[in-house]
Amino acid sequence: IHKPGDQNRNQKGDLAFNYKNIPVSVEVKSVAKNTIKQNLFGWSGKAAVKSSDKKVLTFSDGSTADVAMLPRGQFTILAVCCHAFTGSWKDFQYCLNTDLPMPNSGSLTELQKSELISVLIPVQWPPVAPFTTDLQSVLDRAIQ
């Protein structure tokens, strides 16, 4: 397990390791306290998944956009700490990068949206698909 350097453009995420000889990277975020609401099923909130600065990204069709959103595929798994919901630093939920929502910005084309991750990711406690507390199942899906 290692932490890729912040300036490493080839490997992103907060943790990187090999799982069954396949490289996996995990981006770790937490639920923003100011987004938490109690509902009939438990708790809901949002995790902010974004770049620290806006940057110009080039998309597969050659178009560009100046955004703070992260490109899809830059890490393998999103891990969200759910301390704000449960009071425990041990409670996490996990989701594959490919299952995260696209942004709904009107200034982006459909192709650009499909290649980006939404900045605010909705999460609930207890977790609702595509999130799960079962990291093993997400790791197994990641290497398929």
Positions of PLM-derived features:
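Non-catalytic C-terminal interaction segments of nucleic acid-processing enzymes
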Residues: T64-A65, A84-Q144
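Catalytic cores of nucleic-acid endonucleases
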Residues: K29-G87
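Active-site beta-strand-loop-beta-strand hairpin of nuclease catalytic cores
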Residues: F17-E27
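A short acidic/basic microdomain associated with nuclease active sites
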Residues: I1-N18
